[in-house]
Structure formats: C-alpha cells, structure tokens
C-alpha cells in the first residue's frame, strides 16, 4: 500500500451567528460536500499564509489568520491501494472587509438563495474558486447541520459527525506525485514543564540537522497518528516522561532548502511544527528511551534561567521566549 502525507490549513469565519462554508466542485477534494474554506499548503508556505490565500481564492474575501484553534488528523483509504493521511490546522479568521465576495461576483449570486441540497441562505455565491469550489455561503449552524459536511467541518462546528460515503475523497487530483528532493514533515512539539516550572529539553544527536542544540521534545507524527498522541509518544521516547497536553500554543514553519541529514544528500525540507503546552505532573529523571541511533542524544530538566543560556533550536528559543512574556 502507498502512503501519502498532506497538510491543510482551514479557517473559521463568523458573521454574527453565521459561519462561512464552501462546497467542493468537481476538481475539489470532496466533490459536492460542504466544508470550511481552506486547503493544502504549498511547499515552504506558512499555514497562516496558506489559509489566507485559500480563502481569497475560494471566496474572494480578504482575511487575516488569528488564533490556531485546533489541529486534527484523518486518514482515508482508497481502492487504488493508497492511504492518505492529512493533518488539518484550523485558524480563527478576521475579515478585512464587509463584503461576502468581490463586487465582480455580483452577477454570480444565486437568484433565490437555494442551496439545492439543504436550507435556504442569503448571500450565496456560485462558480467560485476556479473549479475546486462551486458554492460559497454564510450559514447558521442549524442550516449547516442540514447539509453534507466533511467530518472535520462538523467537528469544528460542534455538529454531529457523519462518515462520508466511500469514494467521496479524491486524492488522485488533490495530491500530485512527491518531488524526489523535497520533503514535507509534520511534527508536534511540546513546551514541557513540571509543577516547579522546570522545562524539559532534548539535545539533538550528531548526524541530524541542528546537532548539539537543545530542542523541544517531540517530532514527526506517524501515519494515522493524531498530533497530541504523537507528542506524548515522543515525550516517553525522548525524555522518559508521562505528560498531559493542556494547551495548543501555535504553529511554527520551517523551510530549509538544503538540509543535510541521515539521507546523505541535501534535501529541500519543509517542516510544519505545531507546539503544545504539556505538563508532567510527576517528573522523573530525564532519560532517552528510544533506540540507539535516534535523533536525541540526551534530555534534561532546566530552570527557565538555565534554559535561555543553552544553545537552543529555533523552535525551542521561540517557545521559551514566548513563555516568559
């Protein structure tokens, strides 16, 4: 079986009691199904920029990305022998104008406001998004509940989640073949503390990018793994600690066009790294439990004053710096 990974960025935008949703067209990921606006991130693209771009393309609205609200993963299997894992990031959006869409879309408003497969809503646009999206609407939750929604959209809106029929997802159009020298890596990392306020850090082993730097516990998630599950697994492997996730802090974007790692040749790396706050209620001595030859050389507990004097990775410096504000 072939395994594909994908990262998408989506937005939740409210206008009073109405939320902005789009329906995928024939070239979309879920043809005929309604979802939150957004889509796949491009190589090296920050998820915040990706959601702003996708919303503009699909709705002609100008928005800004606000707080990262949630990150979830889903897996779809296909008869062609392909399993697609998608990590989806959901941002709260702020509208930069007071229009549903650009004035040029006025002649595309549906005359009677009918959605065809559900309730009636005003301000409906059709034929948006260049074929990937064919309808755009502001809907109340009651109206949205009467439509066919992607599971991730229903979950984000607090509505009942209904599995889609087999064959609804179309990865052959949505997922081009991977570039031989490009890598996309989705990872979950933790600003891990104990009740005394100490911070757990891990040192990157030789042979890996950033060798010798002190890093946040965490790493790439496995196929089919939720981000928080992967983070807590890595916490055990890299630091020997049992923790609990208490807060989603944000997302960091890494692009290194010539990263040299265990592969032995320079690769164009794009890393999407979500950061959580993790509490270890009963800390123990930090011990690396993963097999020898892994990316972690050692781990340790540090006060914040000690941590800021260490050679830190970019993401560790970012998280520790923000925690002290």
Report the location of each language-model feature.
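A generic structural micro-feature
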Residues: 3, 33, 81-87, 130-133, ...
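Acidic, metal-coordinating catalytic segment for phosphate/diphosphate chemistry
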Residues: 1-12, 158-191, 204, 266
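A structural signal for short, well-ordered beta-strand segments
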Residues: 11, 68, 89-93, 188-190, ...
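NUDIX/MutT-family hydrolases
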Residues: 103-113, 117-161, 286-322
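Active-site-adjacent beta-strand/loop module that shapes the phosphate/pyrophosphate-binding cleft
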Residues: 17, 73-107, 121-124, 254-287
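A short coil-to-beta-strand element that immediately follows conserved catalytic motifs
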Residues: 62-71, 242-251
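Conserved Nudix-box catalytic region and its N-terminal flanking loop in Nudix hydrolases
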Residues: 18-58, 198-241
